[in-house]
Amino acid sequence: MCVVGAGPAGAALAGACQRLGLATALVDVAPDRPWSATYGMWTPELPPDLPAGVVAARAEGRVVALTDRLLGWEYAVLDVPALQAHLSEGLSGVRVYASRAVGSPRPGVLALADGTELQASIIVDAGGQARPLNLRRRGRERAAQTAYGMFLDEQLAAPLIEPGEALFMDWRQEHGEDGWPTFLYVIPLGGGRVLVEETSLARRPGLPLPTLHRRLRTRLARYGIVPPADAAVERVAFTVDHPRHRASGVLGFGAAAPLIHPATGFSLATSLRLAPQVAAALAANLPRGPKPALTAAHDTVWPRSARIVHHLRRVGLEALLRMPPADVPAFFEQFFELPERHRWTYLTARDDVAGNVAALTHLFRASNRRLRGHLVRPALLPPLPSNEPVLN
């Protein structure tokens, strides 16, 4: 089999397949390039086989919408070089091609930019947001999560979080601007460093990074924080409403699938947990041929229950995109007032239909008439074409 994309999802799946005895190849234009993103997940989502050393910091989750509250959940921030080293160790025996995949012209064939064609029983697109094997015409404008962050010394960032704490969301308008709502995200990284980030959860199209940079500096200034001129920065921009990967004869995996939670942007925990399951489905069914194996793998990534939950979450995303900016903090206040089991299910349980329906039903019943309208309207209307009329 052949996996396109040597990011966390692709590396995890390629390694899992190799461990089960499947001859595996991995294709990436720069397979050894260091991963630059910051990754975190809730502690109960950590895969059981992930070494303890891959977790750089653990912190108690806190949110601020209309009020300030602790979530009662622990957030794990990963040591990304350690994660990459761990997953790379699993690639022993995997044949790696440093090349760019340009398509799958026919079943079982992967075309590379240099004209080479690789033969494989199963081809997986784990190429992230680029989805190099899902060559479809661009449709409507996509919604994106964007963020601008800075890496600061923990003492400099001390006014924002207490020791042992992670600020998951702070919706207070301390950035001093009207227009599209954004929140502050602050997490400890270990080693005395903290990431402070101004984030637009979702917008169609994504909120420009210069806007987020400006807001972050204004927000930090309110706390007397002046970042050093040489502070390292993080720039984030990724689509949160890609349609499901439907390229013929290809399995989409990771962000390419997309396994991204439409309402949070998280996908790593799901990808790491699914990788061994997908590998097992392929290994069990390949003796029957590529088609049964591909079907089994696709059903592992997208069982009917996961498709239903993904649709419900997409409706939630559209509700957020249509919501007047002034109502967004009140919406999140209502959401975080939900019983813990409902919050946890909506944020993490990708195939629990009954649990997600119960969470949304509870949210609807607890909401006032105005918020109920915001929740129902997206289910009755087509996706909003653009948020551009809203000031940014």
What are these regions (language model features)?
Residues 9, 32, 130:
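Conserved Rossmann-like nucleotide-cofactor binding loop
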Residues 1-9:
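Beta1/beta-strand and adjacent pyrophosphate-binding region of the FAD-binding site
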Residues 93-227, 244-246:
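Predominantly flavin-linked oxidoreductase catalytic cores and closely associated redox partners
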Residues 16-67:
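N-terminal FAD cofactor-binding segment of flavoenzymes
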Residues 279-392:
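C-terminal helical "tail/cap" subdomain of flavin- and related membrane-associated enzymes
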Residues 69-89, 126, 202-211:
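Short beta-strand to alpha-helix junction loop
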